[in-house]
A protein has these predicted regions:
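Short, basic and Ser/Thr-rich N-terminal targeting/leader segments
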Residues: 116-118, 125, 197, 221
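Residue-level detector of anion-binding/catalytic polar loops
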Residues: 120-121, 186
Length: 298
């Protein structure tokens, strides 16, 4: 996946709809709903005006931070329908003041320390596919910093014997699979947002995947988690399994970035399938389809 992300919609700028495609869509909608529908122009970053940043990062952080219009607009919203509509209309009323792109865990620590010292809102940002306002700065609040983990995107270690991999949290789904593939492995977690969502985001939101008839949620793959908190770096103990009391990982899974910024995790991986096949089936009723799916799964 190469190219710059669209600041207003899903995908890359190079894949934005052409004028002809937009007009065709408007014509179909007009016919379908019996009223005139016009296609709005594709938003241009040159037309976006944001409020001035309310804070400035210290010199030690400026190498990997920015307050450019594109970066702030892109990190203003997730990708829910409401988010896209506001972005198309150019309604960026509450953008983050600074966007940080830390390249190491130490830079994540330094950024979070600055946020604490300066009383700033820190917002972890993975792939930006949130549909519940998880990456949106709170209204009427303090200056905010969006901490984008996209530079932390590597598979650091593979334990082939135990079938586990140590993976940085900012890696997106396709890049993760690309790095596991040469070793004969796959994570086999494919949420709908797979193309533009990150491992850290999957863990923080307790992601569920499409191919989920066996391992339903990301929970099933997590061996241990490492994250930066306001009190320092925290890491759960990596174990093949444990029955000793509550699992600390369960506290992190689904925490939505409220407890800290996930930087890496040990994940259970699987061997890549030798054969793959797919088929489509039709049923006479919803109930018949439901019953068939239930029998297959059970």
């Amino acid at each position: 996946m190469t190219g710059r992300r669209s600041f207003w919609g899903w995908g890359l700028e190079k894949d934005e709809p052409t004028n002809e495609q937009r007009q065709e869509t408007a014509a179909r909608l007009s016919k379908r709903f019996g009223r005139e529908v016009t296609a709005p122009p594709v938003p241009r970053i040159e037309d976006v005006t944001l409020r001035a940043p309310r804070t400035t990062p210290p010199a030690s952080l400026r190498e990997f931070t920015t307050s450019e219009t594109y970066d702030r607009a892109w990190h203003s919203y997730g990708r829910s329908f409401r988010d896209v509509i506001r972005a198309v209309r150019g309604q960026f009323d509450n953008p983050p003041d600074v966007v940080a792109y830390p390249r190491t865990e130490a830079e994540v620590v330094a950024t979070l320390e600055w946020c604490g010292e300066a009383n700033l809102t820190a917002i972890p940002y993975g792939g930006g596919s949130s549909v519940v306002a998880g990456v949106e700065p709170p209204e009427g609040g303090r200056p905010s910093v969006s901490i984008d983990l996209s530079k932390l995107d590597q598979v650091l270690e593979i334990d082939a014997t135990s079938r586990a991999a140590r993976i940085q949290a900012g890696v997106l789904g396709p890049a993760l699979e690309d790095q596991l593939r040469p070793h004969g492995f796959t994570l086999r977690h494919f949420p709908q947002s797979f193309e533009f969502s990150s491992l850290g985001g999957w863990i923080a939101t307790r992601s569920g995947g499409h191919y989920a008839t066996n391992h339903t949620h990301i929970d099933d793959f997590v061996e241990s988690v490492r994250m930066v908190t306001p009190k320092g770096v925290w890491e759960s103990r990596r174990l093949p399994g444990s029955g000793a009391g509550p699992s600390p990982d369960r506290m992190i899974l689904g925490s939505e970035g409220t407890l800290g910024i996930i930087t890496e995790a040990w994940m259970r991986i699987q061997g890549r399938p030798v054969f793959r096949a797919s088929a489509g089936l039709t049923f006479d009723s919803w109930q018949a389809g439901y019953e068939a799916a239930r029998h297959v799964v059970q």
